[in-house]
Every structure is written in structure tokens, then in C-alpha cells.
Amino acid sequence: MVNKIKTSTHEPKSKRLTLRPVSGKEGLFYGIKSDGKRYTVRSDRLRYFFPDEWLKFLECIKPSRVILFETLLQTGGRIEEVLNLKPGDFTWDNNSVKLRVTKSKAKKGESRVLGGKQRNFGVSSQYCRRLRKYIREGNIKDDEFLFKISKQAVSQMLKRGVKASGLKEWEFSLHNIRKTSGMWLKTVQRRGFDLDVSEICMRQGHDYETFLKHYGSPSIFTDRDRDKIVDILGDMYKLR
């Protein structure tokens, strides 16, 4: 099987990028760039963690790094947003967080803030207790980054954890955790919790049309799954 994708609407129809399936990895394709470098493309980017998968995945992560992945799930933030978080971005009195650096671009080892609308929303008290313990034990100051690690290192950690938990590592990227966060909130909202779709869109930094386009149907989760999702998310929005 060979998939062909046009590189540009302005190029001749005969000039196409050819994607070929990666042996033994269903749904993963590879191509060769003009500079000879190989790259991979997933046919389905809408892969969400099921709650049991998420819990098993966390068991395969180094204990000191679990809080990083919990932060990705609790905030639904992009990896760049989460890696720019500092203790001072949290308000412990009401268990809320402000994502200040919402868009950034790295070039030649330098990170440049591009702007974007800041987002301020609540997270669970259970998560906040674990995060505050992490901050105390690491003696992290209010103006220091919570997670002193590169995006590439986190990505590799994710891949290793996913593979160790028995899942297909090529089906997951860091962005899939963000997708999971939004999908889980959509799932509990469908279940009857007083959680407006506009609130979910605000958390994710999406408009309504983008949210509808990029998130699937909550019907993929069973009632048991939804109960576990509520348990994992904690008392965010008084879900429990």
C-alpha cells in the first residue's frame, strides 16, 4: 500500500510526496524529504488514552517524572506551555493555574515567545497537593521552571513509557495527552456534569469549530471508563 500526498496546490500534479507503510507498525507511514531525511506520519492522530491505559502508562514512568505527565493531563496544555510553568503561575487558595507562555518557537537553540492569549482555569486539589510536595522536595522557587527538561527528552520518556505499558508507541505523541484531556472533559460533560463546552474550549485554547473538528465522540468510553476518568481528574469542576 502506498499513499500519495500532494506537496502543494501550486506544484504540477505529477510532483507528489510518496508515503510508504512502516513494516510492523499499522497506521504509520514514512516519507523522504528533499534533503534525504526520513520522516513518519500517522494515519490517525485522534488516539486517546483510555483510563486504564493511562494508569498503566504512569506505572511505567519514573516516579519523579509522573507529576510532569499529570500536569499535561490536568491542564491540557501544549508541551511548550507546560515546560514554561513556574510555581508562581499557580494560585493555591483556589487551585488554579495560569498558562502565560501559550506559543513559542525554537530556533538555533533559542526559544522565542510568539504571544497568544493567556488562559487561567482550575485544576484538582488532589493534583495541587502532589505538585506542592514536588515543589517542596525539589526546593523550587516561585520564579523557577517546574520542569527542567527538554521537549525532546519528555517525548522520548513518553515513547518508552507507552511501549513498556504494552501500547503501540507510534500511536502516541505528547499532543495525544492534550487530546486526551479535552476528550475526557467532553466525556464527563456528556455524562451530565455542569460543564459548558465553552469552558472546555477556553482550557484548550480552541474556538468551538476547532474543538468539534479535532475531538471525537465520547461514546467510545463505557460507564466504567467515565467513572475512572472522574476519579483520575479529581475534584476539578467538582466532578466528585
Predicted regions and their residues:
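C-terminal secondary-structure termini that scaffold catalytic or DNA-interacting sites
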Residues: 1-35, 40-41, 224, 228-240
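DNA breakage-rejoining catalytic core of tyrosine-based enzymes
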Residues: 25-54, 108-125, 140-141
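Major-groove DNA-contacting interfaces characterized by cationic-aromatic clusters
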Residues: 38, 125-157, 163
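Basic, Lys/Arg- and aromatic-enriched nucleic-acid-binding interface segment
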Residues: 49-79, 189
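Conserved tyrosine-mediated DNA breakage-rejoining catalytic core shared by Y-recombinases
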Residues: 84-130
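Short, polar N-cap/turn motifs at the start of nucleic acid-interacting alpha helices
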Residues: 90-92, 191-216
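Catalytic-site neighborhood detector that most strongly recognizes the C-terminal catalytic loop/helix
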Residues: 105, 204-229
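Short, basic (Lys/Arg/His-rich) helix/loop patches that form interaction surfaces
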Residues: 140-144, 156-202
